[in-house]
Amino acid sequence: MVDRRTFFRGAGLTAAAIFGTGLLGACSSAVDEQRAGAATGASGAPVRGGTLKTGIPADVIPATFLTNTSGATTVIGLAYDTLVRYPHDKVEPQPRLAKSWQLAADGLSLSLELRDDVTFHSGRPFTSKDAEFSLRTYADPKWTAQLRSTAAAITAFDSSDPHRLVLTLAHPLGNVFDLLDTVPILDSESIDKLAAGDAFIGTGPFKLVSRTPNSALVFERNEHYWIPDRPFLDRVEVSVIPDSQALLSSLKSGQVAVAGGLNYRDTETLGETAGFQAVSLEGAELQVYVGANVTHPALADVRVRQAIAYAIDRDRVISEVFRGSGYPVNLPWPKSSPAYDEARNTTFTRDATKARAILAGSGIAVPTLPLTYQAGNPFYEATAQIVQANLAEIGIPVELDPQEGATFIKALIGGTIPALWVTFHSWAQYVPSTLTISAYPFNALKNSSHYESPAYVDAAGAAWRVTDGTGAEAKDRYRAVSDQLLDGLFLVEIGVVLNQLAAAQRVQGIDWTKRSEIVYTDTYLA
């Protein structure tokens, strides 16, 4: 079993530092209020008003606002809108700020009809020039946005009509609607303040009214939101609580009513406890994996990476760390993906004997390898411990290397992690070409592993350049991509996992995007 000290280390001190002596005094009244609210909400009718208090493990990092990091997803979900939005269970765009569209038969242009009743939090009307600005900004390398390649394939914009935007594309883009689902509509007049972390002005259901870096964000209802009578809530207060046990204590005591970033065991327990609920973010799957820097002398040989792939106990990671909320895979695609392939997902199953034989056949004496992960995250640390034990079993010594969150993200983006790492990736729940064209770990042209392969570049490019990203032609091309991933093995997939929230039962109407941006537009306190 996973060492439970992983999940509790330092919790008491951190909780005391955050809550001080007021924690115990507030505990009983807050819990009583929570239970009373749950009973009142039995009718199921939405209730207007109230303040929702939530907890997240990390603050927004302005420089990585467009990279799908956890703090940014909180702000985007509350304060921003996109042109389209995918439903949870498929990649079929639904109207948001774009109310309709027409993709040319040759896939080389896309015309978007935009809403004319939308304003920014500043009061300025939203027009096609704002949509153009947002897409151009997303393509700017300084923001290191993961779908930048797709945004950069837009070669021309026609925003002459304030309520119509026409995009000219360099070639057919099977994932163009992934881009439109992802890019938040940004305010050109305050973009410098966004970069500094001083203002986050969007068109979303809530507007940011205050931010204390690494501590708290406060949002109030956007009274001029384009969806009538929404949002229901008056206010959302977000506390940044990096320690998972302090966050758990805060939820149990009623200091917050929604918490993201708890370990799966605690979320599972809360889901079985009166007054609480566990919310699985269906359609926003994450993948946990081991990455390898192939410029490391020992990891340059694919046979060493194959040995690692055979050594990892995927079933144990899914069952112990994620409490069965997921399933083992060899490839990144979730079961809902048009690229999912059951047969290819059994290529590497745990076989320590075979792993040792492959390692011996390589003739490489593998030195101690650092295994880097984001410190303070219980999923990563527990997974890293299992991987460390698995690799020790086949003769590969591993030293755990926890890094502070911003440092880890910078190293991942910059490709400076020295050997192995454990983290999540996303984007596989989208049109499959998005992953191999865009995501840092997978990008065929430049990735975090420094893996280079003309065959992989060709396969990824061919899968991208299709008009219909879910059609038969695309699926054939995705199989070629999957084969390249298994052959190169610069990333060793462990499993698909469902992101989860824990919440008080009285919090109803929680929604989310495919990027795990939590959406409180329809949320109310019962």
Model-derived features with residue positions:
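Extracytoplasmic/peripheral linker and loop segments enriched in polar/acidic and small residues
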Residues: E399-P402, A406-F408, I437-Q505, A526
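Ligand-site clamp/hinge motif
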Residues: H224-T269, P397
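Long beta-strand-rich cores associated with HINT superfamily self-processing modules
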Residues: L501-A526
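Gly/Pro-rich hinge or "lid" segments in bacterial periplasmic/extracellular proteins
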Residues: P87-H88, L173, L180-P231, R235
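Structural transition elements
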Residues: Y327-G361, N377-Y380, G469
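N-terminal lobe/hinge region of extracytoplasmic solute-binding protein
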Residues: G55-A105, R136, I201-G202
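Surface-exposed binding/hinge segments that line
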Residues: E113, L147-E189, S210
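Alpha-helical secondary-structure segments
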Residues: K53, T127-R136, P162-T168, G204-P205, ...
